[in-house]
């Protein structure tokens, strides 16, 4: 499991680097996104991955790797938005955004390590296409919960 932690930290470093570069270029413009908009952005990325997996070809010169990076970053943005609520304008500094990014990346690592212990790294035997399908399924679930205004019966 030590390798898993290092691999996670490496992937998060790659994702954070892109997040930081986009913060430099655009600032925290994503602060205006409502939770449903973040959900839709993740859906768009996951749907593109599935389309590429199914068709086997892309017309835009970006592969699935960049889409998975975007899913990670939008996922963290979503967690930040759920904590703070959306804003009418970018209302934080780039540095504040990175502190929050790091907070949720750390929380995600801790959760992954706990689940990894319980599931004994079964995910390593999964196909990439299964990840895509699971992400899409969870997005559809999230959209349904959003449609119900968060009121679920279980």
Residue ranges and their predicted role:
Residues 1-154:
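Intrinsically disordered, low-complexity regulatory regions
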């Amino acid at each position: 499991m030590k390798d898993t932690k290092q691999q996670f930290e490496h992937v998060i470093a790659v994702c954070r680097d892109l997040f930081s570069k986009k913060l430099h270029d655009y600032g925290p413009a994503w602060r205006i996104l409502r939770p449903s908009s973040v959900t839709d952005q993740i859906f768009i990325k996951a749907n593109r991955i599935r389309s590429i997996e199914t068709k086997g070809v892309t017309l835009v010169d970006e592969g699935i790797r960049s889409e998975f990076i975007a899913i990670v970053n939008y996922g963290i943005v979503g967690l930040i938005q759920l904590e703070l609520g959306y804003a009418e304008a970018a209302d934080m500094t780039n540095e504040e955004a990175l502190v929050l990014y790091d907070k949720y990346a750390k929380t995600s690592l801790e959760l992954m390590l706990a689940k990894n212990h319980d599931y004994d790294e079964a995910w390593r035997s999964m196909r990439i296409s299964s990840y895509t399908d699971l992400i899409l399924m969870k997005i559809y679930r999230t959209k349904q919960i959003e449609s119900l205004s968060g009121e679920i019966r279980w």
